[in-house]
Amino acid sequence: MQVYPKFMRSAMATEHFPPVTAPEFAFLGRSNVGKSSLINALLGSKQAKVSSTPGRTRAINFFSLTTSPERQQPNFLFADLPGYGYAKISKSISAEWPKFIEPYLAERPSLALCLCLVDSNIPPQPSDAQLTEFLRSIGRPYLVVATKADRLSGNGRTKAKQTLSRALEAENLLLCSAKTGLGMKELWGEIHRVAAEATEAMKQNQRPPSA
């Protein structure tokens, strides 16, 4: 399905979040996990800035997506959250976490799914396990997306999937590559499925109670 992305805004405070209008998908992951590259591959454009400097993103960047160029209201939103786990920026991210990152993850009513990006080429990291544990504690559904899978052989992908799924308690894990397109169709399928369910749930909540 063709989508039409548009950058909305950057937010470093809860009052700067966009209005709740459509289901949202949060992209989270360690710095240099390939988060911006994956978002750009999904969008088919260079909307998210790719940097060789880890931790460049310090705000939540929101993108609106529509399935028609004429549509004004977004069908759903992508939220690109700051990377974590890099020594030089760990203190700054830790300081920002309670200000607007944790409130977004814990309280945002339109957040439909958290996409937790991990590097398929390295062992599971403690910070990744801490993130998924936090999401489970607040009842947020999440999908683990293992990036850079094009660098692994067939057996390597199988082993990585098993290891990461077990370490992160992931019932569903997708191996993806922004470079080759591996797993992107499946990832889009999951996003569209969740978006459709969340859109219907939001409509139900907006309907007045019957007499």
Swiss-Prot record:
Domain of life (superkingdom): Bacteria
GO cellular component: cytosol
PROSITE patterns: G_ENGB
Needed cofactors: Mg(2+)
CDD domains: YihA_EngB
Residues binding GTP, per UniProt: 29-36, 55-59, 80-83, 147-150, 176-178
GO molecular function: GTP binding; metal ion binding
Binding annotation for Mg(2+): 36, 57
Domain (EngB-type G) ranges: 21-197
GO process terms (BP): division septum assembly
Keywords associated with the record: Cell cycle, Cell division, GTP-binding, Magnesium, Metal-binding, Nucleotide-binding, Septation
Coiled coil residues, start to end: none
Functional note: Necessary for normal cell division and for the maintenance of normal septation.
Family: Belongs to the TRAFAC class TrmE-Era-EngA-EngB-Septin-like GTPase superfamily. EngB GTPase family.
Full protein name: Probable GTP-binding protein EngB
UniProt organism field: Acidobacterium capsulatum (strain ATCC 51196 / DSM 11244 / BCRC 80197 / JCM 7670 / NBRC 15755 / NCIMB 13165 / 161)
Name of the encoding gene: engB
